[in-house]
Amino acid sequence: MPRRRRRRRAAPGGQVPPELRLAYGARALTLGRAVFSLLPSPRHCESPCPACRGRVASGCLACRRWEHLLRDGDPVAYRRLITRAVCAIAADDLSAPPPPRYTPGNSGHSQARLVREMMKSIVADQSHGTKNVLCNGLHEGGQSICISDLVSSSSWSILLHRIGDLLMCYLLRCTSIFLPVKKNDYFQVSGVPLNVVLRNPIFASTVARKHQPQTTKAKCHTCYLWKSANMAENLSICHDSSNSGVNSSFSSTCKIVTQQSCETCGSIRRAESKDPSEGCNCPKFPSDGRSGECCNCYTHNTRKRKRLYSWQRRSKKKQVCSVDESSAEWSKLNGSNFNMSNGPSENLAGKMNDQAQSVELTVDNTSLARSNDDSSSEIKVINATILSSEKSPCSVFDIRGSQGLSCHYSLSEVQYQSTCPQVGPSSYLHLNSCSICFNCIISNASKHLSLDSLISRNGIFYNRRTTYSVFHCKHILSKRKRPDALSLVKHIFGINSCCASLLKYNCHESTIRKSNCLCCWLPKSIKNLIRNSKRCQYKKLFLKHCSVKCKVAPDVTKNDGKAHYPPGGKAAYYDRSFSRLEAYSTHQQVASFVWAVLKRIVPKPLLGNSFGKRSLRTNIWKFIKLRRFETFQLSDCIGDLKVSHYSWLSNIEFSNCFCSAIIGKQTGSSTSAEEQKQKNILHCWISWLFSDIVIPVVRTYFYVTERESKRYDVFYYPKSVWRDLTSNAIASLNKKNFRILRGEPRKAVRHLNCSSRVRFLPKAKDMRPLVDLRAKSKDANLNKCHLIMKKLRDEKPEMFGSSVFDYNNVHQNLSQFISSKRSQLMKKLKVYIVVADVSKAFDCVSHDMVLKMIDDAFKCDEYTVRKCSKVICNRSKNSLYRFDSNASIGNGNSIYDLSIQLSSGGGIFVDQGTICRILKEQFHHLLYEQIKCNILKIGQKYYLQQVGIAQGSKLSPNLCSLYYGHLENSVLSKFLHDSKLNAGEAFSEPEYLLMRFIDDFIFISFSLEHAQKFLNRMRRGFVFYNCYMNDSKYGFNFCAGNSEPSSNRLYRGDDGVSFMPWSGLLINCETLEIQADYTRYLDITIISTITVKMHSSTKYIHSKLCHYMRPKCHPIFYDSNINSPGTIRVNIYQAFLLCAMKFHCYIRSVSDANVSKLELLQVIKRTFRYMHSLIVRRMQDVELHYNVRPVLKLRRKETIWLGLTAYIRVLQQKQSRYKDMLTLLTAELGRYCHLGHECDTLRYAVDDSHSSMFWKFKF
């Protein structure tokens, strides 16, 4: 069934970016639609236009609309302004004036003059607090820059002529306009800055509040239980002290005590009562310190009274009814013998029973109100003696055990219940003594952990420190004062600070057996854990499970601390010492060591039974084998663990104690609630076990890092092995490039804190030092220097020689060369290619030479950098983020261009009006400090780099390209020109193509002699520049004679076609066609190149597949000017082959993903459509921004057919897992089966001989 085409919009107008849609809502419109929204609604055709009144034959904007605004023959820039620029109209509730009345024509002023006058008017009004981006670029002398130039172009002049002066002034002053800079990037030119709008309370109330979690406050149930017991005790004391008083005085006394107790429980206030002057019959009682005032009438009104919502009033009415019923039941209980009070209290209780008094308490969000009867002013009070003995004080409050984790929640209801737990006097006396049982505190006051909470792995990476203690000094197990068992219990289970004082060795032995009581068993086990952690012999366990002697080469072992060098000398010794790069511990060894430590430290019952131990060890192994950027959630720590695996946890009886009876009556607890409490205790224990035991043990004994050749796989090097590796690497660097600082220079460096930290990254045979230059003080200056150098790169590319910085530059150069040499290629002349790589390119750069090059390149006396803010939208979270970015404006005072750091993701750039001027001397000083005074901190020592530039800085690639560009211009270009003249060739057209990506050279020529001379020249090196080639990375497709290098990077597939790999590309040595280089996957596993999210949804899987396809959708692979139709389809087929392999690795890693086969099929099909659309979109972008006109000859049906064939071909190798999926894919392929029979290029693309390397991949 053919796919339906989307409807086109009737009226012109583009889409509004999501950032502006989220910030302004429906007020964000395209500029054309925004202009029409300022006009009155159109009238009927019979009535004349009120603006032009029919005097203009062609009509006006009010009556003709789009026909007047957009006309035939308008420039493309003007149409783009009307249909793609976005305008946000001011809201009605703001202080913006109404739009002016439209009148056709204008006063004859130019757009530039109108903008200048408008800027002066806005600046004059800025004293009132108004802000406008249009005036951010206004100098003190009144000269406009940047933004004013953007809104004074010829397109804006056309718009002024068609909408008039008044509407143009209103647009510039009262609206926010955003101009398209790139496909997905916009630049604000008028209105309140978008970053200021995002901080506006109005925006926060309408947008941000929807996405920020609401923090509700509720009280800790255990605290209420304890404090309510204190309140009941105060009430009972009040009875004894008021046996001779009248009922009214006793009533007022009880109310005072109740209020004071409630105030200690939390923020519970008495509601606003009637005025004391309106007939209050209560006697005055001066016990609260306010003599002469009625304590019943006195209220502390903290805020204005407001009427309750309807649902709250209905709930309040229900509570009054329930209290009436409960008062009847309490009157029955008063007649029973279940009363603990004796003496005068009993007589007082009898008197109170005859009067049938009761309390009605209602609570809303702000206050605790006492309801009075309308017919009489008599206040009903419950017998305080009965409340203190029969009714649980906890039942006064609405205790919800499922939320009792935080002490900052607010009560929603406080009421008396109609029933009370029937418990014995001894249990109540225990509660009234202000102590709660151990079980209830652990189960109700423990922190609640979500299964989605993350276990932080950042602590295990790149830790070089060697300590004698496994746990760091701030760890609870390594404090000088050994923690007691209760302190560790509070730490493990996260007991709330307000409940920590209640946790004691206390339980109700009469109701709970000692064998099942946490109070009797858990502290004893925790004591054993503390003692075992001090006595465990970690080092012996480490040497037993993680021995590396068998992996270390015998020629690198030390003998009495002295190195015995082999015949090759020190260099050969250092080369052989790097065999220790393979002396890392495997994942199984690390997991075995961690498990051995746990068995020595943790008591056996806390590890669970045999099934629990097996599951826990499996989860530890999963944690150890995670890749670099993968996350580990609490649900992954739990895995298959169950409460039944832990006898001490499954046998806890929560319902036998007095505390749990009270909570059960209030919350209606059931078996499921008790199981949830047990699970929460298990979650707290397992989370602490991983965070505070497993991670510190791994961090102490291993240096955890990734390797350059193994992508995201994580390697665990023992600290002793890593110390040897880094010492050898530092020794080699110290011998060549670095000098250690001692004495006064070291003290000065430590005082100024101007050093950069270094970490080493293992390579295949040596170590690469990476410098961290992301400190804020350095990063800001480096950003400015980077922008200035980038501007030089754009204005004077010849100073960088043949440098290319991305595939777009390669595409541009290669397309021009092939178009000029099309005739030679058609004749199938031999093409000669040479590839060379500079050895240690960054380490051999001469400081004095690169500084001299900088002096010659940067001639301007002053550079200007302008500050911008960028607002981006996170589509997955539907929220906005803002961060600062720099925009290079120009050189000196001649500032008319705007060079913004654009991004493919898109965003909104807002000019901040902040200009930073950098003088030439200041710029040279910054670069001098970066190059000559680069101080690195390795361990506890400081090193000064004497030769080379640091890797890891933004400036390093540009400085390196400038250095080798100078080498090309001064040496290589002269050499190639002289050899060409000696050969007698014409000099009109270039006979060769030279490109360089930082330090990787490629030379293409149709002359064998020319290619041989270039190869020989590169092999000799360049002594003056301290530049030599790497002998193991040469590549050439011809016979080099007797002096042929020992290695050649030429790749030849099963089809016999030779390719030259260079910078991620495979270049056909016969036709110069381009394919992607997948040879780097031959030595690694495919799964090591992906990052898996354990609990992935269908949407997330689709995003990952699209992410895998994105790098292989560059136009250089699908341009018909470079590649043949067969090669284009081979590139698509190979991209889908790799994506299918990563798809299998991802689905295999997410074994618990509940995704059906049909959903996966839809995800795969959407990936095909996404790739084709992305190819088309990037083709258009290259044509727009580069001087390249690519040609795409590819249909969507062919892309889908190639994708389905690639998935079937890959998943057939895993047939047992994807039997149903293969059936669905085959059925889907049947809809396009005619393409495979009709198109020869498709059959050529899916031939296995053209993709022979893929069948050698491990996935």
Swiss-Prot record:
Task: Indicate where this protein resides in the cell.
Answer: Nucleus; Chromosome, Telomere
What Gene Ontology terms describe what this protein does at the molecular function level?
metal ion binding; telomerase activity; telomerase RNA binding; telomeric DNA binding
Q: Which transformation does this protein catalyse, written as a reaction?
A: DNA(n) + a 2'-deoxyribonucleoside 5'-triphosphate = DNA(n+1) + diphosphate
Q: Which GO terms describe its biological process?
A: telomere maintenance via telomerase
Residues involved in Mg(2+) binding:
D837, D999, D1000
Question: What Gene Ontology cellular component terms go with this record?
Answer: chromosome, telomeric region; telomerase catalytic core complex
What positions does the domain Reverse transcriptase occupy?
A: 742-1067
What is the annotated tissue distribution of the protein whose record heads this document?
Expressed in shoot apices and immature embryos.
Q: Which SMART domains match?
A: Telomerase_RBD
Q: Taking the first listed entry, what is the main subcellular location of this protein, grouped into a coarse class?
A: nucleus
Question: What keywords does the record list, in alphabetical order?
Answer: Chromosome, DNA-binding, Magnesium, Metal-binding, Nucleotidyltransferase, Nucleus, RNA-directed DNA polymerase, Telomere, Transferase
Q: What does this protein do?
A: Telomerase is a ribonucleoprotein enzyme essential for the replication of chromosome termini in most eukaryotes. It elongates telomeres. It is a reverse transcriptase that adds simple sequence repeats to chromosome ends by copying a template sequence within the RNA component of the enzyme.
Protein family (similarity comment):
Belongs to the reverse transcriptase family. Telomerase subfamily.
What quaternary structure, including any partners, is listed in this protein's UniProt entry?
A: Component of the telomerase ribonucleoprotein complex.
Q: What is this protein called?
A: Telomerase reverse transcriptase
